[in-house]
Design a protein with these regions (language model features):
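Thiol/disulfide oxidoreductase modules built on the thioredoxin-like
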Residues: 79-81, 88-137
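Hydrophobic, well-ordered secondary-structure elements that form the walls
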Residues: 29, 72, 85, 116
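N-terminal "domain-start" segment that seeds a small globular fold
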Residues: 1-20, 131, 137
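Short active-site neighborhood of thiol/selenol oxidoreductases, capturing the structured segment around
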Residues: 18-40, 46
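Structural microenvironment flanking redox-active thiols in thiol-disulfide oxidoreductases
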Residues: 41-79, 90-99
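Flexible loop/turn segments at secondary-structure boundaries
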Residues: 16-17, 35-38, 67-71, 93-95, ...
């Protein structure tokens, strides 16, 4: 896989989080937004994966395409999403990280290996679960 583009964005509480901070972990990057129905539909699946593998080193970074901070925070809280969250709060067309990862539609997910390289992208549902299962069996 090619190296995952490096980025740093802001968390809801104003801290910075960079992808390189999570090196050494398998990282799932989930591009989503509070206004995206299919994204919210996929969350229970992402949540199940997180609950199963976080203790074994899986990290998830939700990169939100929201431009309204309050909507973003409410969606995180309502859906009970306890992993890392970041956003530029510039929306999909102006988010620099969306450009880096060629995000033109969401949800879009990337799996990044411990070495910082892209393992897979665009998996959802059962396919996503199977791929994560496989990575943790190795």
């Amino acid at each position: 896989g090619s190296p995952a583009p490096e980025f740093e964005l802001t968390t809801p509480d104003g801290k910075k989080l960079a992808l390189k901070d999570l090196r050494g972990h398998i990282v799932l990057i989930d591009f989503w937004a509070s206004w995206c129905g299919p994204c919210m539909d996929e969350m229970p699946n992402v949540k199940a994966i997180y609950e199963r593998y976080h203790a074994r080193g899986l990290e998830i970074v939700g990169v939100s395409m929201d431009n309204n901070k309050s909507n973003w925070e409410k969606a995180i809280e309502r859906a009970g999403l306890t992993w890392h969250h970041v956003s530029s709060l510039k929306g999909m067309n102006r988010c620099p990280v969306a450009k880096l990862y060629q995000v033109v539609a969401i949800p879009k997910l990337y799996i990044i290996g411990k070495d910082g390289k892209i393992i897979a992208k665009d998996l959802r549902g059962e396919e996503l679960r199977e791929k994560i299962d496989e990575l943790f069996e190795e």
